[in-house]
């Protein structure tokens, strides 16, 4: 039985490696937006400091180590409407307590409708504006003098992203460790893709009312495989945060001071994407 499982794993690894080598693979920075914009108003306002937050079923999305600090009856639903209704997103988060180790599940959806497709509206007939004459500028893919755009050829398509985030956490000595597996189904017009990734988190309480958190998103380099054979890969992002709660003796209010530091390994420029393949 062990030999059988070992053989199956070797075969699957070989097929996966072969499919990767036979397709175009890109290092990119965009593609998992539904995970970056998800959250409720409270936790999104914390920015990177959200890695120190805990107590709700949305918190593990920012730091998986908070998965064991969610109330058993905690259920979150969030709806976002952005860019005058063009972008709509939903999030549902809840704790699963039926296992020996706590699990937290978050389901996400983001959709954009009525995206104009203008790829085929150029009447690329050249300077004379007459098709088939072979004059200068004909079929060069540029809008030249004498050419025009046909608005009747504008088509519209939609984009849909559906994702899940399943996390757990465990304590060892003075640290809490967290691990999350996430998946994404991305539909863009007539194209579709599926991706997987892993997040890792740490949470510590080094002093009274103080918290330090660390999250490594896409620690295994996440993948997004399109039905065309193109593979998009995403580099890890490191986010660290620190927070302290001040209890005001003369007032029932509390004051939270927070700070964060982010290191995005994908870089900052728009033209530094790398490509390898055949």
Q: Model-found features: residue ranges?
A:
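Bacterial Sec-dependent N-terminal signal peptides
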Residues: 1-25
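Subset of outer-membrane beta-barrel
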Residues: 24-278
């Amino acid at each position: 039985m062990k030999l059988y499982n070992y053989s199956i794993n070797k075969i699957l690894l070989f097929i996966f490696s072969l499919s990767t080598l036979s397709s175009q693979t890109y290092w990119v920075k965009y593609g998992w937006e539904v995970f970056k914009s998800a959250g409720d108003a409270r936790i999104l306002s914390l920015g990177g400091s959200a890695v120190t937050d805990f107590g709700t079923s949305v918190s593990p999305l920012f730091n998986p180590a908070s998965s064991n600090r969610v109330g058993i009856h905690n259920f979150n639903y969030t709806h976002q409407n952005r860019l005058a209704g063009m972008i709509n997103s939903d999030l549902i988060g809840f704790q699963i307590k039926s296992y020996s180790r706590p699990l937290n599940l978050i389901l996400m959806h983001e959709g954009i409708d009525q995206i104009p497709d203008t790829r085929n509206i150029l009447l690329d007939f050249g300077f004379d504006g007459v098709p088939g004459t072979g004059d200068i500028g004909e079929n060069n893919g540029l809008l030249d003098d004498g050419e025009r755009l046909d608005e009747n050829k504008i088509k519209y398509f939609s984009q849909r992203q559906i994702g899940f985030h399943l996390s757990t956490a465990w304590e060892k000595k003075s640290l809490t460790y967290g691990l999350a597996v996430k998946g994404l189904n991305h539909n863009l017009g007539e194209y579709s893709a599926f991706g997987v990734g892993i997040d890792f988190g740490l949470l510590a309480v080094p002093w009274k009312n103080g918290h330090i958190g660390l999250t490594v998103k896409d620690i295994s380099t996440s993948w997004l495989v399109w039905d065309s054979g193109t593979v998009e890969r995403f580099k890890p992002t490191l986010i660290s945060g620190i927070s302290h709660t001040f209890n005001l003796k003369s007032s029932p209010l509390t004051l939270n001071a927070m700070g964060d530091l982010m290191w995005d390994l994908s870089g900052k420029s728009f033209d530094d994407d790398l490509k390898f393949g055949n």
